[in-house]
Structure formats: structure tokens, C-alpha cells
Amino acid sequence: MGAGPVFCLGDIVGYGANPDEVVSWVKKRGVVCVLGNHDEAVLTGEVSWFNRHAAQAALWTRRVLSQESRAFLGALPATRIAEVEGLKILMAHGSPSDPLREYVDPSTHSDLFEFYLTKHKVDAVALGHTHVPYVWASKVGAVFNPGSVGQPRTGDPRASFATAEISGHQLSVDLHLTPYDIDTAAEKMQQAGLPPILWQRLYRGI
């Protein structure tokens, strides 16, 4: 599938066993990123509001992450507006108003979605954090979450991502699922000594 710019909505690191490799992959391909709450926790070491498994993984990542990767993550903005073919897309991990903490799920009232679009004068808002994919669209614009390429929360273990097509100054978003090598990811997490629940849940998509 042909593609233009690639966006990542945060949490580049924090759960998996290959954080430096992931950062290197993102940098090499020029992926446009924003900071996620797990990225921030790895940078600061502040994990008091994480559950113990997520906290352990974040602190492990903090110990093994290279200075080069830290510098890359530390330079990421909490929000950014990307312009693609004349359309403006606001990117945030959580929400536009609380980029690192707030969860915006599919049941969010449409008035709030429209508020995001009109307040920031954008054509679309792309969010992460929940690991649950959805697309909301109206005449005002679109708000979408591509889901997660790791640690899904939908009961489906496949990696989730979104593609957007622009035609006639209109944005249409499609969600996709694709299988990946869970066995290898889980094995590497076990070898790293990460909490078992974090690799076991990969098989269940929860």
C-alpha cells in the first residue's frame, strides 16, 4: 500500500524488550511522533501513577535505553499539528487538552469531538493512549484513534493501525488489523525479565 507521511501517537517505548531498536526504526523512517505517557515515564522515572507491572517495565526501559534514544524522546512535543495536502491534523497521545493523561474513547460525546476540531482549527484529530481503534467523522472533521501496534486492548491480538486518504480536501480514515510475530516479541520480553502479564496479554489482545 502506498503511503505518505507516517505518524506515531506516542508510547514508542515502555512495554517491549527492544526500545532502542524501535526508536532507531522510527528515526530512520522519519516517522512524525508525539510524546506518550510511557515515553515520559521512561525519561523522568516518575511511575507512581502506573500499575506495578507498567511501572516495572518503564523503569527497566529507563535503565537500558541509550542516551541517543533518550535525546530523541526528550525532544518530542506533547502535541503537534501536521499539514498534509492542505489539511491540518492535530496529533496527541491522550487528548488535545491533556496530551499525556486523558483517555478519549469511542463513547465520547460528539460535542467534545467537534470542540476539539473547532477550537484548534484543524481538519482532523489523531489520538492514542486507549489502545482502542475508532473513527468519528462529521461535516466538521474527523477524530480517530488507530489503536495499538502492540499491547492491544480490544480482545484481538493483531496489530492495529490506520490509513488516511485525502481527496478533494476531504479526509477518510480506514482501520486495519494485521498479524505479527507475537512469539518472538513474548520471548524477548521473557528474556528481559519483564513482568509475565505483559507478554502473556499479547496473545489475548487485552
Placement of each model-derived feature along the sequence:
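Glycine-rich phosphate-binding loop signature in dinucleotide/nucleotide-binding domains
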Residues: 1-3, 84-85, 118-121, 167-168
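Short acidic-hydrophobic surface loop/beta-edge motif
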Residues: 78-86, 136-138
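Anionic-ligand binding region
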Residues: 106-146
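Active-site neighborhood of phospho(di)ester-bond hydrolases with catalytic His/Asp-centered motifs
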Residues: 6-11, 32-37, 92, 124-129, ...
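Core catalytic region of metal-dependent phosphoesterases/phosphodiesterases
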Residues: 1-74
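Active-site-proximal segments of metal-dependent phosphoesterases and phosphodiesterases across multiple
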Residues: 49-56, 85-120, 152
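Active-site environment of divalent metal-dependent phosphoester hydrolases
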Residues: 14-16, 38-43, 97-98, 124-137, ...
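Acidic, His/Gly-rich catalytic cores of divalent-metal-dependent hydrolytic chemistry
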Residues: 124, 136-206
